[in-house]
Amino acid sequence: MKLRFLSTLIVLLLGVKAATAQTNMQVFYDFGSDRKFVTMTLEMFKADKWGNTYFFIDHDFNYTDNNGNKDHCAAPGGTYLEIARCFNFWQNTKLAPLSLHAEYNGGITRNYPISSAWLVGVDYFLHDQSFRNTLNLKALYKNIHRTSSKVPMQFTAVWTCKDFLGLKCLTFDGFADFWWENHGCDFQPDGTCKEKRTVFITEPQLWYNVGDLFGCENLNVGTEIELSNNFGSTAGFKCRPCLGVKWVF
């Protein structure tokens, strides 16, 4: 669950005079057949005169003890972090939509670590005249610790559509990632697995600002659908729907 509102907030780069920060928290229940647990995400975006900083932390409440007993309320069973910095020293020029991008990813699940990854590249920002519809496109060199890949690259798209389909308070946003990574999936008891070389994941979200109805614009309710191929330890295509709430601080 990443980059939920980056493409919306990056418009601040075009006119911000002082540092501006936005933070939100999302709580989702994942209905995926191999999930069925709660994930909490904390996000922060801050724009400044040199660009912007973004990070999120996911906590999966899927803890299982050594005897295989599920105790999801005891503690997070997995945690994942992404932190990214866009450098843009030319915000008042025609090159303002183009930024240099640096990023770190890493975490751990209840079964295996998520290897540290370092990414560097470029980010290009597109928008309509109102800035209510935005798109970020990223081309990144990706180095994953102790992992090989045929092409050490990741391509990312991040989008936001405010007042989606002309409906006030409805927002459609999300991201899509594609990268190369040699990794094992569908591990069997005898230790065998399927070898995969690419990964794709997208998480479109639909949010309704229900709080606007009673004077509390912080509160949103909505849905997310994770669509992935060879993501994590699961081979092939997977669809995992979620329902959740978001509070914008």
Feature roles, as predicted:
Residues 4-15:
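Sec-dependent N-terminal signal peptides
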Residues 19-22, 50-54, 88-99, 126-135, ...:
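Short loop/turn motifs that connect adjacent beta-strands in outer-membrane beta-barrel proteins
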Residues 21-65:
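Short glycine/proline- and aromatic-enriched beta-strand/turn motifs that initiate or cap beta-hairpins
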Residues 27-33, 59-63, 102-110, 126, ...:
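Transmembrane beta-strands of outer-membrane beta-barrel pores
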Residues 42-46, 83-87, 120-126, 139, ...:
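Residues on the lipid-exposed face of transmembrane beta-strands in outer-membrane beta-barrel proteins
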